[in-house]
Design a protein with these regions (language model features):
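Conserved AMP-binding/adenylation subdomain of ANL enzymes
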Residues: 611-640, 648-688
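A short, small/polar-residue-rich loop/turn motif at beta-strand boundaries
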Residues: 1-3, 37-53, 72-114, 194, ...
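Gly/Ser/Thr-rich phosphate-binding loop
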Residues: 659-662, 687-691, 701-770, 774, ...
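Non-catalytic, low-complexity flexible loops and terminal extensions
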Residues: 10, 153-224, 297, 428-431
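Carrier-protein-dependent adenylate-forming modules in NRPS/ANL systems
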Residues: 1-171, 263, 294-295, 324, ...
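His-Asp-centered acyl/peptidyl-transfer active-site segments
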Residues: 3, 21-28, 56-57, 113, ...
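Flexible, P/S/T/G-rich "lid" or insertion loops adjacent to the active sites of thioester-utilizing
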Residues: 17-26, 190-246, 336, 434-439, ...
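AMP-dependent adenylate-forming
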Residues: 327, 341, 350, 358, ...
């Protein structure tokens, strides 16, 4: 028996990956060679047997003993002549041949399956056309040695045709590779390589992917999409000629790296690069799997040219080649993590300069890859040819990509090459990756211009009250008011505020528990021409004091029991308000103006000191008029006020019903945290319209049974969610339980509540493929932009930074002009306009919605 050898180079990773996977044939590699011409099939079959016998790794056996895996060459193993199959009389010879190959590949072909790890077949599909099918286990060969074996078999066939002796084996015994590898592991070179890769790992940027799905640490799929791109129109050749000082391989790599970076919207990312790991060693002519995929940190500068990027990447690879023997799995282990635990890189790049040509007299040979092993994400094989053209083969994990998306990405690469061919001095940051028609598509999505009246919240409410004075308007557990009665209370309180010194343009703080008096106070403040500043009484005293110090309101409305909390705030007029006032008429004061600030709401402070966001009257008027148009309320509707007033969602609860003749009912303080209390509240008041933060909707759904959903939620006609990502499965559960339409809204505090919408029920919900419902489409007079790091629009499917524009922008941050200038920036696509940088990452979906 031959010497027992340990697994080396790529073998341990392949062995472990197969053991951990439930995929039966993922680690098989296969291709077929299409032979056109006169072929002596029996002679070729003899050449196959002779050629296979010359590669000792093809006779390897494997065993595992006490956790250690060993391999040895089975000297007694012989190879049978490959089967010769004649399909010339078949209706579809090509399809039948491909089906035979796929059937072979779909078997359990794991190393311990008992099936042959080496398999050849000769299939005749026409008089002078053959398919030579070849399949190996990846433990035996790699992408370098596979075509080398095919080439040697072709050489043997040609020798047999000429009546010459079988050519000697060009292949090194794999035992030499193992010995050399073990010597390397004990050498100073290994220590130097370890130090080099430790430093590279520290500097390595995070991996990127063209897929929106999270990048897995280890692939769970061998289902691969293949796309072959042929750049034979001369544009790559033209570019290479213009940049004669740059190697074509370096140019191809730079184009691929830039294309990936721009489509990932990542100027710094980690890709994989395939190294032969054969230079100057026994492995140079061995057939075992020694290829190494190592992490390549790609850094793209917007202001550099393509030649500069190509030269820099080439220098980087030159340095890496000196250390290419070090295992990628060892790099991960050196960083304290298990191989496969998390991805080291995303897409894999491979410059293929292997000789795939077979020199058989009178026969044309073309190789067609069938299986190359699992693809974690995306692999790009770059083939610069001797004519100066370029072809690229894209392999994509089918669980992460679909063919139309890949084809679209490929079109962008062609467009990128064309731009550089037209202008080789073009900067990397100035390349356009938008396809023709996509600018018009985005313009159509943002065509939201609607003329709205130049008015204010108080004017809209007064107008509605005049139409329906006797309709029920506002209620809580103790009080209820008609529209006329509500207006009388609002005007009375507004006049009282004016007597206490409140002037138009001022701000008034409100620290009231949830009740009718909270709603009346907010309406009175805008009636007086001022802006309201909500203070959540559940906040700590220090936070409330900080908000008052920053906002410096002219007055505080609170209750007797809350008053002591504000005793040490200087220069603050206080008004205790917890009972109806004597009516003084309901005529509008008409003090509020469209340019006034409507409200000031402080951010959560999760990213530092809370900031007061000022939102203008015109912005919130647009938002409410859009909502009434899109989700119309009538006099039959009952809206729940359950959102804490410190969150801007409460704004539409406090005002929307009163521009539509609907009724607002106030939940008890803290009831919004109690799902059972909310069930009772909905049932008692016949609530038709309400809002949930998704996490609270989940708690509410968990409290429901089919029976209680029928009893307590039957009046609900429309339910809104915002504030967090809305899980699609939660929407499906809600739909099944209640049937009430659910709507997803999105908007930061720096907007007038929400800037986008998406149905989270029915057909739209059924079409959601991600884990969360999209944030959707822009509301009236609002634009959504998704931009890359260079402030260029990104195409559909590409992630970028989310911005919004136009009428619903907040006025800015209270007393923070520096911060306002950094977040509310000039809109480069609309001179004189501003846009807000949300900090969220988003992408356009094919239906025009934002996700």
């Amino acid at each position: 028996m031959s010497q027992h050898l340990p697994l080396v180079a790529a073998q341990p990773g392949i062995w472990m990956a197969e053991k951990l996977s439930d995929l039966p044939s993922a680690w098989s590699v296969a291709h077929y060679v299409e032979l056109t011409g006169e072929v002596d099939a029996p002679l070729l079959a003899r050449a196959v047997v002779a050629g296979l016998a010359q590669a000792d790794t093809l006779r390897m056996r494997f065993t595992e003993d006490n956790g250690e895996v060993w391999q040895w060459v089975d000297d007694a193993q012989t190879f049978e002549l490959p089967e010769i199959i004649d399909l010339r009389t078949n209706i579809d010879p090509h399809g039948t041949a491909r089906a035979l190959m796929q059937a072979d590949l779909q078997q359990d072909l794991r190393v311990d399956s008992g099936k042959p790890l080496v398999f050849h077949q000769l299939i005749q599909v026409a008089d002078n056309r053959w398919y030579w099918y070849q399949r190996y286990h990846h433990l035996l060969v790699d992408g370098f040695s596979f075509p080398a074996i095919t080439r040697q078999i072709a050489n043997i066939y040609c020798a047999l045709l000429r009546g010459e002796p079988t050519p000697a084996s060009p292949f090194t015994p794999f035992a030499d590779v193992v010995e050399e590898y073990q010597q390397y592991r004990e050498s100073e070179a290994w220590q130097r390589d370890a130090a080099f890769w430790a430093e590279q790992r520290r500097q390595l940027p995070p991996p990127a992917s063209l897929s929106p799905a999270p990048l897995p640490g280890r692939s769970a799929s061998a289902d691969i999409l293949r796309l072959k791109l042929e750049f034979t129109d001369g544009e790559f050749r033209q570019l290479a000629t213009q940049l004669s000082g740059v190697q074509r391989t370096d140019l191809a790599l730079a184009l691929a790296a830039l294309w990936l970076g721009r489509l990932c919207n990542r100027m710094d990312y980690a890709a994989g690069f395939i190294f032969m790991r054969r230079l100057g060693s026994a492995a140079l002519t061995a057939t075992g799997p020694v290829l190494n995929v190592l992490p390549l940190g790609i850094h793209i500068a917007a202001q550099e040219t393509l030649p500069q990027l190509a030269t820099r990447l080439a220098a980087q690879l030159k340095k890496m080649r000196r250390h290419q023997r070090y295992d990628a799995e060892q790099i991960v282990r050196d960083s304290g993590r298990a191989a496969g635990e998390e991805p080291l890189f995303g897409p894999v790049l491979n410059i293929k300069v292997f000789d795939y040509q077979l020199d058989i007299p009178g026969v044309q040979a073309q190789t067609h890859p069938l299986a190359t092993g699992p693809v974690n994400d995306l692999e790009l094989a770059l083939f610069p040819d001797e004519h100066g053209d370029l072809s690229i083969e894209i392999l994509a994990n089918k669980q992460r990509y679909d063919e139309p998306t890949l084809i679209q990405h490929a079109e962008r690469l062609k467009m990128l090459i064309a731009q550089f061919a037209a202008d080789p001095a073009l900067l990397c940051g100035d390349v356009d990756i938008m396809l023709p028609g996509e600018y018009a598509q985005l313009a159509q999505i943002n065509a939201t211009q609607i003329e709205i009246p130049e008015t204010t919240l108080s004017a809209l409410v007064a107008e509605q009250a005049a139409k329906t004075p006797d309709a029920p308007a506002l209620a809580d557990a103790r009080y209820q008011f008609s529209y006329r009665e509500m207006r009388e209370q609002v005007v009375a309180l507004a006049n009282l505020l004016r007597e206490r010194g409140v002037k138009p343009g001022d701000s008034v703080a409100v620290a009231l528990p949830r009740s009718v008096f909270l709603t009346l106070a907010l309406h009175a403040i805008v009636e007086a021409g001022a802006a309201w500043l909500p203070l959540d009484t559940g906040y700590p005293d220090d936070r409330l004091k900080m908000m008052l110090e920053d906002a410096r309101p002219s007055l505080l409305i609170t209750t007797d029991d809350q008053l002591p909390r504000f005793a040490d705030v200087p220069d603050l007029t206080r008004l205790c308000y917890n009972a109806p006032l004597t009516p003084q008429g309901s005529a509008p004061l008409q003090l509020s103006q469209p340019h006034h600030t409507a409200y000031i709401i402080f951010t959560s402070g999760s990213t530092g000191r809370p900031k007061g966001v000022m939102v203008g009257q015109t912005a919130i008027v647009n938002r409410l008029l859009w909502m009434q148009n899109h989700y119309p309320l009538t006099g039959e509707d009952v809206v729940a006020q359950k959102t804490p007033c410190s969150f801007d969602v409460s704004v539409w609860e406090f005002f929307w019903p009163f521009i539509a003749g609907a009724k607002l009912v106030m939940a008890e303080p803290e009831a919004h945290r109690d799902p059972l209390a909310m069930q009772q509240f909905f049932a008692e008041y016949g609530v038709t319209t309400t809002h949930f933060v998704p996490s609270m909707l989940a708690a509410f759904v968990a409290s429901l049974t089919p029976q209680t959903a029928r009893q307590n939620c039957s009046t609900l006609k429309q339910v809104f969610c915002s504030g967090e990502a809305l899980p699609a499965d939660l929407c499906r559960e809600w739909q099944q339980l209640t049937g009430a339409p659910l709507h997803n809204l999105y908007g930061p505090t720096e907007a007038a509540v929400d800037v986008s919408w998406y149905p989270a029920f029915g057909e739209e919900l059924a079409e959601v493929r991600g884990s969360s419902v999209p944030i959707g489409y822009p509301v009236w007079n609002t634009g959504l932009r998704i931009l890359d790091a260079m402030m260029h629009p990104v195409p559909p499917g590409v992630a970028g930074g989310l911005y919004f524009t136009r009428i619903q922008l907040a006025q800015g941050y209270l007393g923070r002009p520096d911060l306002t200038a950094s977040r509310f920036i000039a809109d480069p696509f609309a001179p004189g306009e501003r846009m807000y940088r949300t900090g969220d990452v988003a992408r356009w979906l094919d239906n025009g919605a934002v996700e």
